């Protein structure tokens, strides 16, 4: 009798769908065997980047490309005046592969090149699919592949780095908008100017957006053209490697925001009609074009596509020493309708035949491969449908991600701020939303990410304070709206952080309430960089209130990080009284008490808590966080015995709770 998969054992409600779950699991097992071949492994299979593309050999150069629909292929570039010449014609071999070998002296480091691909009825210039370096001409704006063979390639100093994940505290960032200046930041500037800030703040991982080359800067890196090339607008491959190496030396893991859910439509720069056909890498029917993203959808049922994408995962892990990936657009991959306009209200919605089983197989194999290449690697899914098993082990019947993004939380905060008066904020609803997750899957909590900061949306601080940010952020300027916004910003972030069961993520600048929105240069804004940067000077200034939020974030991150395995300790609710708007919960020896009431401060407020002594750790009302110092931090609180609760080891913890404040206490028996 076949053994029941663990995800079904752990959730009896999945039993009616066991055939579908087992079928998906079996599909992945079968496909892995097929790809690995007799005596091989998935790790062996994922070596396309070592065969295709341009490689230096002992005798010269070798170049290969998969282009089954092509009738002729030429290598063109600065070395042959960009013309088709017989000596640079590729030869077709088995499997639709084209190859050429060249003498050593034909190509040099820095040379630019492309392919000229011919097919029945047409031809076009193409950037090689496996190009590891593409650059854009500043005058013509044309992209080309570039030979990258420096005389002294970068050598990593930190070997065998192991990420700290107990808990995982992620700083989401974008290299280009990482500087104060109105322009594009570089890998080197980020390494020198931003990494030290992240280290000081206490985050133990960074998640870098927009690494894979993309023609349009304003796409935020999500319309990828060259999947193996680190974006050259930020610097060289060696400078990115140095950044990652430096992060590792500081104990900071580096996660890459990887895009395997779709590709840019561009044909000259990207994979669209690479060999003249419509279905080489992508679906050839109505599924080819994404209905919402103006991009192309991969055909995950093709082994050549799996070869390309799986090898891509391995390439970034080995070549650049990334510590894992946050997979973008997973919902779009999982469903034929990309999850668009669909409400996921029951388990039926996950097993009704509307799922792309080929994509599920790919994601399962990708997770298995990544963890084989690096057992300490981190994988995170950006997925909003709530697909069960997404962050369960493959061996348990899951898809194999380590974490899933808790995407309902930022939506909850936006809805609460927009639609509810302060006096209607309910602690019961807040606690339920923050802890409503599958017991056997780890999540990444967050109050907001880059999505909420984009033009057309608003960050939490901007929703709370709005235009008063422009006029009333001086330390000596007392404005009720600003005070309210700062108080709630602190509470929202701490309650979201304190309830994690896996990790937490913050987008750069949001920790100190960076004003306004993100808007990359485009025709509609006059190609301005004004809103595509981070104004670090705001948090550095002693006369501005941003410093209060920055200091609070630093201290709560260090607090959670100081508690090993904080994310694994049970979240024990002690008190949630909607009438008073008070919430209290315990994790290990820390007790978090929130008073969301906008107008009432409570003296000697009683909370039922384990009997013992409670000492102050921090509170949001301290003046270093922009508060009023209404709480005496020197007082130790002994619980008051109550005959009704004493048999259970519980007593009354009496506290002073200022309005719109949170305090953290340490419990001692």
Language model features with spans:
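The feature marks proteins involved in alpha-glucan
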Residues: 1-62, 83-84, 89-172, 177-182, ...
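Short proline/glycine-enriched turn/loop motifs at strand-loop junctions of beta-rich domains
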Residues: 66-73, 609-612
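Conserved alpha/beta catalytic core and glycan-binding cleft of carbohydrate-active enzymes
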Residues: 135, 143, 321-323, 341-532, ...
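Substrate-binding/active-site clefts of carbohydrate-active enzymes
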Residues: 135, 153, 157-165, 170, ...
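Active-site rim elements
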Residues: 178, 350-355, 476-485, 537-547, ...
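Catalytic cores of secreted or luminal carbohydrate-active enzymes
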Residues: 535, 544-563
């Amino acid at each position: 009798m076949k053994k029941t998969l663990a995800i079904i054992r752990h959730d009896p409600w999945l039993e009616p769908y066991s055939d579908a779950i087992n079928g998906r699991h079996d599909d992945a097992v079968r496909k892995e065997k097929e790809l690995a071949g007799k005596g091989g492994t998935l790790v062996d299979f994922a070596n396309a980047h070592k065969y295709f593309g341009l490689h230096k050999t002992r005798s010269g150069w070798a170049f290969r490309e998969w282009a089954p629909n092509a009738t002729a292929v030429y290598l063109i570039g600065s070395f042959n005046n960009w013309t088709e010449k017989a000596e640079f014609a590729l030869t077709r071999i088995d499997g639709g592969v084209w190859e050429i070998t060249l003498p050593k002296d034909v190509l040099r480091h820095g040379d630019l090149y492309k392919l000229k691909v011919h097919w029945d009825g047409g031809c076009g210039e193409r950037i090689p699919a496996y190009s590891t370096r593409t650059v854009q001409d500043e005058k013509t704006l044309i992209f080309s592949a570039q030979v990258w063979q420096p005389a002294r390639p970068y050598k990593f100093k930190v070997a065998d780095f192991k990420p700290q994940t107990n808990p995982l505290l992620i700083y989401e960032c974008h290299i280009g908008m990482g500087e104060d200046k109105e322009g594009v930041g570089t890998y080197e500037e980020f390494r020198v100017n931003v990494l030290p800030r992240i280290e000081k703040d206490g985050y133990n991982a960074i998640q870098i957006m927009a690494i894979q080359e993309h023609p349009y800067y304003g796409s935020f890196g999500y319309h990828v053209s060259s999947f193996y090339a680190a974006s050259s607008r930020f610097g060289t491959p060696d400078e990115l490697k140095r950044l990652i190496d430096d992060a590792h030396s500081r104990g900071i893991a580096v996660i890459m925001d990887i895009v395997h859910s779709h590709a840019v439509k561009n044909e000259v720069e990207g994979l669209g009609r690479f060999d003249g056909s419509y279905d080489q890498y992508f679906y050839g029917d109505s599924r080819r074009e994404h209905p919402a993203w103006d991009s192309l959808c991969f055909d995950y049922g093709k082994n050549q596509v799996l070869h390309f994408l799986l090898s891509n995962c391995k390439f970034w892990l080995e070549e650049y020493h990334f510590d894992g990936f946050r997979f973008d657009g997973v919902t779009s991959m999982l469903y034929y309708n990309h999850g668009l306009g669909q409400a996921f209200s029951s388990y039926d919605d996950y097993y009704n035949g509307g799922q792309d089983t080929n994509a599920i197989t790919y994601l399962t194999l990708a997770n298995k491969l990544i963890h084989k290449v690096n057992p300490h690697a981190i994988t995170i899914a950006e997925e909003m449908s709530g697909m069960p098993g997404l962050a369960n082990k493959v061996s348990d019947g899951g898809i194999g991600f380590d974490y899933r993004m808790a995407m309902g939380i930022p939506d909850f905060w936006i809805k609460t701020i927009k639609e509810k008066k302060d006096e209607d904020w309910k602690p019961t609803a807040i606690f339920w939303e923050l802890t409503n997750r599958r017991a056997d899957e780890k999540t990444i909590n967050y109050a907001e990410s880059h999505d909420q900061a984009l033009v057309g949306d608003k960050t939490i601080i901007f929703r709370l304070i709005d235009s008063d940010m422009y006029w009333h952020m001086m330390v000596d300027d007392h404005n009720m709206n600003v005070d309210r916004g700062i108080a709630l910003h602190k509470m929202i972030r701490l309650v979201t952080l304190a309830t994690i069961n896996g990790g937490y993520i913050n987008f750069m600048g949001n920790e100190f309430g960076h004003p306004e929105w993100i808007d990359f240069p485009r025709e509609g804004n006059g190609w301005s960089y004004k809103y595509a940067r981070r104004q670090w000077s705001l948090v550095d200034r002693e006369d501005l209130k941003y410093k209060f939020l920055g200091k609070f974030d630093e201290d709560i991150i260090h607090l959670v990080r100081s508690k090993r395995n904080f994310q694994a300790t049970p979240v024990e609710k002690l008190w949630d009284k909607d009438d008073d708007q008070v919430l209290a919960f315990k994790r290990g020896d820390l007790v978090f008490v929130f008073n969301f009431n906008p107008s009432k401060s409570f003296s000697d407020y009683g909370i039922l808590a384990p009997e013992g002594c409670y000492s102050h750790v921090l509170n949001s009302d301290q003046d270093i966080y922009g508060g009023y110092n209404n709480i005496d931090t020197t007082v130790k609180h002994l619980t008051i015995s109550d005959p009704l609760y004493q048999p259970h080891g519980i007593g009354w913890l009496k506290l002073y709770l200022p309005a719109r404040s949170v305090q953290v206490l340490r419990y001692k028996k």
